[in-house]
């Protein structure tokens, strides 16, 4: 098998559009399975995880290799739910072409829009699915696609629609033939006489689209005003590859209508790996280079997905150059390790079929690669390259996670690490300041699924709560206080006495310590103990126990005992001075402020700005993107952002995205300060 015999196809689109059902029908139609599974029955090839079956949604990228007319079509079924967009990015990384799947009754879905945007310049085609269902409206759906994506939209079929707007047969505009489904198979039928004019007009439009992709074809079309099916296919393939043409097909994954035509279109129009431009990469010295798809070159492959579950661990690779065989040793430039490869597999759902090699342009799995992660490159040690991985979105929704019992703490950590191998889009941070383990992902569904997997796979009952905000405390006035520590226990005692001036400063967050002692009232050898006592005291402020920042402390006087004084005594004396001074120094809470950049369609600008006002946000600017969207920049307190990922999704019908990064601390308004102090006290009492 060569790259010319392979097509790598990502199925993308809105959740519920029927991507998994389409993959299932493709398998069934090509004898890849002996029965047609259904999502509602929980028996499809691609949705095999317990959570997928329970929720009836796709959660992970799944693979359905289809053999059609001697060509291997690697169908990659990506989740449509936005919480699992990272899985779609992995599919896009491995695919040369995407099929965007939409439901005929949904018109232009948000998932279709976002998938189109995620693809960048990668080739694509559209399959309007579920045309056999009530309320389906192919015409409205097509109009919406043309309105959004413009002249690239090129229907290559004309549906035969009954009085209920259901599609009963399909006209192939390329070959001027029609098909219906009989007994689960495509069967030729006559083009309805009343559609003759419509079909002729649509074929003329398709010829024009094909001719527009190639100068030679354009001249031929202008000379004769006609193109053969072969010429049309040639032009459309060029247009698909350069992005000027997006073919549109339709049908039903449930009945099989239009599915074989889609398979044929993938064969005819989808590019192969060697059609694609060279990939950006780096050499061993970090220099930017280009790596072309080359079956005869030194081996290079990208790990675009890791499957780690009860069935084992598989590293999914796409071979960019050369060939991968099971007896190879390949170099991983990320870790510096040379990896001896184990068995190779072709994945179909949860099952892996062993194979001897994976050729250039193909995808497959390597078993039991414990030190290899998603995004790593595996290459020939004498020709080291680092291929570009996946640019996953920044996690934007966080929850604190903890086990119900202390005995499960270690199991929780192990489980999260294992799940992170499979899904690198979520992050885990052990926050030493708030004493919480915080898990961050794309949204609440992703976090909920991770908790369910912790339970079923690792036996950990995890609890979620709101992450605590890391406030700071500072003072606003200058105070001088004495700290005197004296303790007598029988013989020798403990004695330390300090006078310290506490004042605000703006030079740095860390405390500035100075000593201005005259006459030896405090010996110099005790200065470090005083400083240490103050720095330790700064870890717990007097308002709510948060770290104290922007503080200057100057040791100005004190006294000592030649026998009883010690470093520990002066350290404790400094602590007493700190505790006495800060309540009188007008302490105030400081809250973390972050920079928010939210990208939204123009129509939602008013709602989003109004919501930011409620969150105490300050709008800093707006920048139009040029495609009907705005990037709104604002500064918002972190305490007001805990549910923003969910709220923005609701406000914008999932069309809004955002990034949020900490920039600085600011004084907390009185009402917010009172609330934060009350929460801190309640937490301290509970613990």
Question: Over which residues does each language-model region extend?
Answer:
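Structural and coupling elements of P-loop NTPases
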Residues: 1-687
């Amino acid at each position: 098998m060569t790259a010319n015999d392979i097509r790598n196809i990502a199925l993308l689109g809105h959740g519920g559009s029927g991507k998994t059902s389409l993959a299932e029908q493709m398998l069934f139609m090509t004898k890849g399975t002996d029965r047609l599974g259904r999502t509602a029955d929980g028996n499809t090839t691609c949705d095999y995880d317990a959570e997928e079956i329970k929720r009836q949604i796709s959660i992970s990228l799944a693979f359905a290799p289809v053999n059609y007319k001697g060509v291997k079509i690697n169908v990659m079924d990506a989740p449509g739910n936005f919480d699992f967009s990272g899985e779609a990015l992995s599919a896009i990384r491995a695919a040369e072409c995407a099929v965007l799947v939409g439901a005929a009754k949904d018109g232009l879905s948000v998932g279709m829009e976002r998938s189109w945007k995620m693809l960048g310049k990668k080739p694509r085609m559209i399959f309007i699915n579920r045309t056999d269902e009530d309320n389906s409206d192919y015409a409205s759906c097509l109009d919406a696609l043309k309105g959004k994506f413009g002249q690239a939209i090129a229907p290559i079929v004309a549906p035969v629609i009954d009085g209920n707007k259901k599609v009963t047969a399909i006209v192939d505009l390329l070959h001027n033939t029609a098909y219906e489904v009989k007994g689960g198979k495509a069967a030729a039928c006559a083009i309805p006489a009343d559609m003759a004019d419509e079909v002729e007009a649509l074929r003329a439009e398709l010829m024009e689209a094909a001719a527009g992709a190639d100068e030679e074809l354009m001249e031929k079309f202008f000379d004769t005003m006609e193109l053969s099916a072969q010429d049309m296919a040639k032009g459309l393939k060029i247009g698909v590859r350069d992005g000027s043409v997006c073919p549109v097909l339709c049908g039903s994954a449930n009945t099989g209508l239009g599915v074989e035509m889609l398979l044929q279109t993938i064969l005819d129009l989808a590019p192969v790996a060697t059609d694609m431009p060279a990939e950006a990469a780096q050499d061993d010295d970090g220099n930017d280079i280009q790596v072309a798809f080359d079956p005869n070159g030194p081996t290079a492959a990208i790990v675009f997905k890791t499957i780690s579950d009860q069935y084992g661990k598989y590293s999914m690779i796409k071979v960019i150059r050369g060939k991968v065989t099971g007896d190879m040793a390949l170099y991983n430039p990320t870790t510096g390790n040379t990896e001896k490869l184990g068995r190779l597999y072709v994945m179909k759902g949860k099952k892996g079929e062993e194979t001897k090699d994976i050729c250039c342009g193909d995808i497959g799995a390597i078993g039991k690669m414990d030190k290899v992660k998603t995004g790593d490159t595996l290459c020939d040690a004498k020709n080291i390259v680092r291929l570009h991985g996946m640019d996953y979105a920044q996690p934007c929704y966080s929850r604190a996670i903890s086990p119900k019992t202390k005995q499960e703490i270690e199991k929780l950590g192990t489980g999260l690490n294992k799940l992170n191998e499979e899904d690198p889009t979520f992050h885990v941070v052990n926050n030493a300041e708030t004493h919480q383990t915080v898990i961050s992902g794309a949204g609440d569904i992703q976090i909920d699924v991770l908790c369910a997997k912790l339970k079923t796979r690792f036996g950990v009952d995890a609890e979620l709560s709101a992450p605590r905000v890391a406030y700071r405390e500072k003072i606003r006035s200058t105070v001088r206080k004495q700290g005197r520590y004296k303790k007598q226990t029988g013989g020798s005692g403990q004695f330390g006495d300090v006078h310290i001036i506490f004042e605000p400063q703006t030079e740095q967050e860390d405390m500035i310590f100075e000593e201005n002692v005259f006459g030896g009232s405090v010996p110099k050898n005790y200065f470090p103990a005083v400083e240490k006592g103050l720095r330790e005291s700064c870890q717990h402020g007097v308002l709510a126990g948060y770290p104290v920042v922007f503080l200057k402390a100057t040791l100005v006087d004190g006294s000592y005992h030649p026998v009883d004084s010690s470093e520990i005594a002066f350290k404790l004396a400094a602590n007493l001075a700190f505790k006495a001074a800060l309540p009188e120094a007008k302490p105030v809470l400081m809250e973390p402020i972050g920079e928010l950049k939210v990208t939204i369609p123009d129509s939602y600008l008013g709602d989003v700005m109004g919501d930011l006002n409620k969150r105490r946000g300050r709008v800093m600017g707006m920048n139009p993107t040029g495609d009907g969207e705005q990037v709104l920049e604002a500064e918002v307190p972190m305490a007001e952002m805990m549910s923003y990922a969910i709220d923005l999704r609701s406000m914008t019908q999932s069309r809004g995205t955002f990034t949020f990064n900490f920039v600085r601390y600011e004084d907390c308004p009185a009402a917010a300060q009172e609330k934060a102090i009350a929460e801190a006290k309640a937490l301290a009492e509970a613990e």
